[in-house]
């Protein structure tokens, strides 16, 4: 209720992506488009840098000598991790898959996740499930040593997780939804995987096809280390050019200055 009252009355509204701006305007049609401004989230480029350290991999049972595809995130419908687990059956045999996934938001998805992982492990013993959210230095190691980072989210207003992976030079395979398409450049910093969304459930209308398509794009990079390296380098460059906190701060200051000097425009 507060949001419904506050947003239409605001002189300016900040959105973290163009997709979020579109969602705001669709939900609140009385808001004038020129009053909604997009300023992306940023990332600390000094903190998120590629490292050759593999101590965290060894700690959590990841084989540093074997390429792997990585997921990092909470176990929720929105984050789509179960779709990646479903995709494991379509990956080349013995592909190492690292699921850094914890904090299920419902008991039902916790049970579903465990069941799907057990089924995946029956087909592929190289599935590593880290059932908690690890420390930042540890997740940087996981990003840095991944052949591919996968973000199978059903929706993301922005998807800062992709910035973190790209800053560590990991190529990204991600669903083409929300703000993700404004971060990941298809065929340059990774692969975008489109899917038809059920308008009632917001889930993929064909989950098996989505899983198969995820696997195809992951397999492309797992099997082509040079392409993966090239995409990873391009990802780091894109983050440096577009998403450094210094640039985001400058944009925010400039917008606030306009708000202060012209509060009713």
Describe every region a protein language model picked out.
Residues 1-13:
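Membrane-proximal helix-turn-helix segments that form the acceptor-binding/catalytic region
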Residues 19, 42:
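Carbohydrate-associated surface elements
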Residues 49-62:
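A short helix/loop element that forms part of the nucleotide-sugar donor recognition site in Leloir-type
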Residues 67-71, 76-90, 111:
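A conserved mid-protein helix/loop that constitutes part of the nucleotide-sugar donor-binding site
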Residues 110-133, 137:
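Nucleotide-activated donor-binding/catalytic signature segment of Leloir-type glycosyltransferases, i.e.
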Residues 141-146:
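Short alpha-helical donor nucleotide-sugar binding micro-motif in glycosyltransferases
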Residues 154:
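Aromatic "clamp/platform" in nucleotide-sugar-dependent glycosyltransferases that forms part
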Residues 171-174, 184, 191:
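Short hydrophobic beta-strand element within catalytic cores of glycosyltransferases
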């Amino acid at each position: 209720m507060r949001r419904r009252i506050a947003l239409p009355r605001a002189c300016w509204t900040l959105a973290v992506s163009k997709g979020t701006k579109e969602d705001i305007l669709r939900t609140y049609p009385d808001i004038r488009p020129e009053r909604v401004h997009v300023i992306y989230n940023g990332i600390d480029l000094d903190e998120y840098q590629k490292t050759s350290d593999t101590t965290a991999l060894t700690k959590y049972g990841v084989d540093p000598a074997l390429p792997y595809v990585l997921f990092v995130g909470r176990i929720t419908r929105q984050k789509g991790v179960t779709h990646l687990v479903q995709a494991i059956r379509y990956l080349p045999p013995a592909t190492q898959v690292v699921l850094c996934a914890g904090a299920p938001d419902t008991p039902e998805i916790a049970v579903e996740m465990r069941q799907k992982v057990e089924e995946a492990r029956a087909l592929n013993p190289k599935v590593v499930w880290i059932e908690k959210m690890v420390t930042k230095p540890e997740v940087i190691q996981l990003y840095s040593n991944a052949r591919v980072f996968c973000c199978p989210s059903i929706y993301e207003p922005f998807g800062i997780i992709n910035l973190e992976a790209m800053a560590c030079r990991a190529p990204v395979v991600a669903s083409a939804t929300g703000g993700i398409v404004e971060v990941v450049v298809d065929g340059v910093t990774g692969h975008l995987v489109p899917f038809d969304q059920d308008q009632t459930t917001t889930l993929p209308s064909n989950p098996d096809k989505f899983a198969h398509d995820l696997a195809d794009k992951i397999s492309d990079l797992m099997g082509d280390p040079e392409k993966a390296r090239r995409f990873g380098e391009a990802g780091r460059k894109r983050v440096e050019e577009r998403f450094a906190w210094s640039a985001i701060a400058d944009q925010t200051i400039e917008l606030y200055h306009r708000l202060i000097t012209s509060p009713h425009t």
